[in-house]
């Protein structure tokens, strides 16, 4: 009898391909043995070790499967919202090709980061948030033309060669989609969980489903879904209009069995404060819009507490057993 245990990587293998290879091997070397393919589960053995970052308690990814839904604006204000709940917070701009954090955190014209005696970069800081971005290291108008491995290497340096100090939460603003940068973060970084940002319309929500399933496949917990640009309040009559549809993200979250963290309206001051590098959570902390972000941040804190206190969390992934 020929037996072997194979642990799968993050995605399920092609059973037909494995069966074909094994049958070929049997004919050549094990003609008198029987080969069987069984599904099973065992302890997680990832291909790439996820190494914790000293001093950082939680790392959360803010993601959107589709661009243009206001993810970076949400990431910035979520970071500031977490900080308003007396947490020490960092903000990492994972979008190497189109960094937004320098502008939104009013660090666009700041000098480049210094390094300490250990050759670690000192993160730039504003509004009490430690920030790191590729936008701090290159000229604003210079394009970054890199292939996947270079992106992964750059992200590792931004993340691990930065002197973050002590952080309760590091918020990572991911680029849209499910490309190299996101896979690097999921496979190499011990993410506590992911926050998905979407607008309410069907064309955005279809991508949300794919994004959520991607995080599930790489075993990153989903902290919840945020509905951005949820509605518009008329400044003259105060009537609410759901321009992109009503509660689309909330209903999607319910169908997928994930948490709905809250919604944020379309509002002129959110756009203006973001473009000027003076986020509304800081400049207008008592406004209804700032309260939306703070409430979402409070829900995220609750989810982080649940994950961190769950001693029975399932860390297993499927294996293939060949007997």
From Swiss-Prot:
Q: Where in the cell is it found?
A: Mitochondrion
InterPro entries, per the entry? Mrp/NBP35_ATP-bd, NUBPL-like, P-loop_NTPase, YlxH/NBP35
Keyword Transit peptide carried by entry: yes
Q: Which SUPFAM superfamilies match?
A: P-loop containing nucleoside triphosphate hydrolases
GO terms (BP aspect) = iron-sulfur cluster assembly; mitochondrial respiratory chain complex I assembly
Does the record's keyword annotation contain Membrane? no
List the Pfam families hit by this protein, alphabetically.
Answer: ParA
Q: Provide the cofactor note recorded for this chain's UniProt entry.
A: Binds 1 [4Fe-4S] cluster.
| Required co-factors | [4Fe-4S] cluster
Alphabetically list the UniProt keywords. Answer: 4Fe-4S, ATP-binding, Iron, Iron-sulfur, Metal-binding, Mitochondrion, Nucleotide-binding, Transit peptide
Where on this chain does ATP bind? 65-72
GO cellular component assignments: mitochondrion
* Single annotated GO MF: ATP-dependent FeS chaperone activity
**Described purpose of this protein according to its UniProt entry:** Iron-sulfur cluster transfer protein involved in the assembly of the mitochondrial membrane respiratory chain NADH dehydrogenase (Complex I). May deliver one or more Fe-S clusters to complex I subunits.
Q: Which HAMAP family match?
A: Mrp_NBP35
Describe the family membership recorded for this protein in Swiss-Prot or TrEMBL: Belongs to the Mrp/NBP35 ATP-binding proteins family.
According to UniProt, the name of this protein is Iron-sulfur cluster transfer protein NUBPL
């Amino acid at each position: 009898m020929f037996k072997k245990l194979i642990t799968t990587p993050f995605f399920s293998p092609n059973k037909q391909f494995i069966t074909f290879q094994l049958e070929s091997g049997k004919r050549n070397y094990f003609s008198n043995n029987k080969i069987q393919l069984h599904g099973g589960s065992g302890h997680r053995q990832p291909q790439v070790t996820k190494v914790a970052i000293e001093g950082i308690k939680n790392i959360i990814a803010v993601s959107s499967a589709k661009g243009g839904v206001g993810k970076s604006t949400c990431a910035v204000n979520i970071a500031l919202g977490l900080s308003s709940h007396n947490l020490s917070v960092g903000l990492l701009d994972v979008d190497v090709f189109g960094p937004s954090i320098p502008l939104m955190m009013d660090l666009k014209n700041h000098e480049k980061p210094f390094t300490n005696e250990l050759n670690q970069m000192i993160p730039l800081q504003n509004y009490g948030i430690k920030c790191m971005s590729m936008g701090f290291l290159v000229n604003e108008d210079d394009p970054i033309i890199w292939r996947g491995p270079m992106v992964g290497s750059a992200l590792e340096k931004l993340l691990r060669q930065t002197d973050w100090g002590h952080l309760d939460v590091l918020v990572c603003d991911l680029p849209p989609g499910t490309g190299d940068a996101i896979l690097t973060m999921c496979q190499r970084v011990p993410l506590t969980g992911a926050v998905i940002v979407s607008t309410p319309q069907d064309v955005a929500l279809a991508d949300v489903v794919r994004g959520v399933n991607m995080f599930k496949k790489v075993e990153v917990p989903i902290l919840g879904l945020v509905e951005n640009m949820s509605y518009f309040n008329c400044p003259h009559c105060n009537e609410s209009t759901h321009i992109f549809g009503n509660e689309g993200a909330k209903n999607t979250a319910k169908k997928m069995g994930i948490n709905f963290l809250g919604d944020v309206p379309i509002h002129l001051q959110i756009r203006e404060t973001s473009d000027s590098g003076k986020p509304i959570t800081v400049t207008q902390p008592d406004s209804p819009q700032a309260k939306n972000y703070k409430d979402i941040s409070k829900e995220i804190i609750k989810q982080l507490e649940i994950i961190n206190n769950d001693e029975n969390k399932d860390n297993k992934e499927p294996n293939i057993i060949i007997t």
